[in-house]
Amino acid sequence: MKGIILHGGHGTRLRPLTHTGPKQLLPIANKPMSQFCLEAIFETGITEIAIIIGGVGSNKVREYYGDGNKFGVKITYIEQDEPRGIAHAIRLCKDFINNDKFLVFLGDNIIQKSITDFVKKFKNSDYDATVLLCEVDNPSRFGIADIENEKILKITEKPKNPTSNLAVTGIYLLTPLIFEIIDNLKPSWRNELEITDALDDLLRQNNNISFERITDYWKDTGTPEDIIHANGEIIKKMLENLENDHIIGKDTVIESNVKINGPVVIGDNCHISSGSSIGPNVSVGNNTTVAISNIENSIVMENCKINSSAEIKNSIIANNSDIKDDEGAKKIFLLGEGSKVSL
C-alpha cells in the first residue's frame, strides 16, 4: 500500500496564521500537525508517501520533510496548482499509486487512535473503499454518512439539514477504482471535485464500501479554536505515562516563582522569567522568552518574546512575534508570523 497526505488549500479561516505558510505546518504540541499524519501512516508500515502541495509556502513543506529519509519514509511531491477539491488532488496521484491500494490522510486532521488495524483490515478485504466515521455535534460542517443496518446508505457533503451525526473524517482507504469515479465526477457548487461525491457515486455503482468508527479523539483543525483544542488534547496524550504534568525542552531555563499548570509543553532553549504562569493547555515553541506573563489555553510558537502583564488566553501567537503589554487586562491574540504588538 501507499500513502497520500493532502497539504494544500488556502486556510482562509486561519488567517493571518496562513499568510506565510500552509495550515498543515502550524504546530500542535510543538510539532507540525501534518507530521502526526505522516507518523500515523508510517506506523501502519506504509513507507511510500505522496504529499500534495500547493498555495502559499509550498517550499516550506519541501524544506521541512525533505525526501522523507529522516522520518523513515520516501516522499514524492505532487503539485496541485489551485485548490480544486480533495478528489481532484487524489486524481493527481494516479501514476504514483499505479495499481496499489492506498491510504489518504488530510494533513489538517488530528487523530489519537492508531489506524494500523483499519489499514490491515482493508488490505486483506475486497472492499473498494473504507471510510472512517466519527460522531460530531455539528454535522453540517462535514461530509455525513447515513447508516442503516451497519451499511452506508449515502454520503452527503455538508448537508444543511443533516440526517446523521456521523462525519466522514479526513482518512480514506481506497483502491484505484476511485480514479475512474473521479474522471466522471462533476464539480460541486464550489467548483470543486468533492471526495464525498466520489464516494457516494462509488456507493451507488457497486455498494462495496465499508466503514469504521473512530471513538477516540479526532479533530478537523479548520479554525483557531479547533487548533487550540487539539493542542491541549495532544499534550494530555503525550503526558499520559509520565509522572509530571509538563515537558520541558533541553537548555530551557525556568526561574523560581514560575507556576506551571499542566498540561504544558515547553520547547528547547526557552527562558521563563519569575512571576510568570504557564498553563493549563499551553505549548511554547523553541527559543521563546516569557517575562512576567500569564498564558493559558494557548499556542506560542518559536522565537517569540512575550512581556505582558495581561492574561493571555485562547490565543495563537506565530513565530517571531513580539508582545509588550503593560495594560494588565485579559487578552486574546491571533498573530501571524513576525507580528509586533506594543500596548
Name each model-derived stretch.
Residues 223-245, 250-251, 256-257, 275:
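Internal anion-binding site segments
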Residues 2-5, 13, 27, 31-105, ...:
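Conserved N-terminal catalytic core of the sugar/cofactor nucleotidyltransferase
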Residues 48-54, 132-133, 299, 316:
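Short internal beta-strands
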